[in-house]
Amino acid sequence: MMKKIIRFLCLLIIVLASVGVAGCQRQENSWQTIKSRGTLVIGVDDSFVPMDFRQKNGKLVGFDVDLAKAVCKEIGLKPDFQTIDWSMKETELRNGTIDVIWNGYTKTKARAKKVAFSKPYLENDQILVTRKNKGIYNYRQMKGKILGVQTGSSGADDLDNYPKVLKKRVKSTVLYDTYNNAFIDLKAGRIDGLLIDGVYANYYLAHSKYQKEFKKEKLPYPSEKFSVGINKKDKTLKNKINQALNHLEKTGKLKKIREKWFN
């Protein structure tokens, strides 16, 4: 009987050791695949100012674009920016069609169950934008009103996680694929308020001729931190990105990129 137990324990140790080695090989192989390819495939929403957006000539620019280029230079890769359906970002990452999510991507507990995160590199808040002529001066006055929010955004998560702030006040919620489309409806009066990332709203309104027509209010949701979303198995890639971010911070290059886009 004792021999059988010992034999079983030996087999168990061998199996566990094999799983551990296989896991390490998968992590290393994924990095080697990326390294051999020479590019980092980056999933973005190309309408999210000032993080990733298109100029009139179609060129992709933004804070995250500049930061991703700087990080890729540090780790010896070329960035390959791919526009994705933002509501499908985690699926794209899991399926391997992209290597990272890098587009004002907020680290949350729910997302951390599916995605690994780099160290944070920027803070953000959720705000409410309304038309001044609507007579809505704070979020409490959204009772019975129509609220716009982007599908798959951290604002949509906050709406569900903290229902007393807005969800239980508003009459209904309209989901949008992009903030651009949401702002069109807000201007036209088809929605009464827009739940939106502060970095987007501040930049968008600062560059809009209609900025005096709108009011902004920081909402009582927890402050957020933007990070790079990485497949959980890609630990080597995560370490490489973190090392690059640390180096950019120490050399002052990250500060220069922040100042360029956020003055």
Located regions from the model:
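Ligand-binding clefts/hinges and TM-proximal coupling segments of bilobed small-molecule sensing domains
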Residues: 24-30, 36, 154-174, 212-217, ...
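Extended ligand-binding regions for polar small-molecule ligands
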Residues: 25, 65-74, 140, 145-146, ...
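Extracytoplasmic small-molecule ligand-binding "clamshell" domains
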Residues: 28-104, 251
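Flexible hinge/capping segments at coil-to-helix
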Residues: 33, 130-147
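Periplasmic-binding protein-like
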Residues: 46, 123-130, 198, 206-246, ...
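Ligand-binding cleft/hinge of the Venus flytrap
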Residues: 55, 68-77, 155-176, 205-210
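Short helices/loops that flank or line small-molecule/ion binding pockets
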Residues: 82-83, 87-101, 114-116, 140-143, ...
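A ligand-binding cleft/hinge motif common to bilobed small-molecule-binding domains
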Residues: 105-113, 158-161, 185-188, 192-222
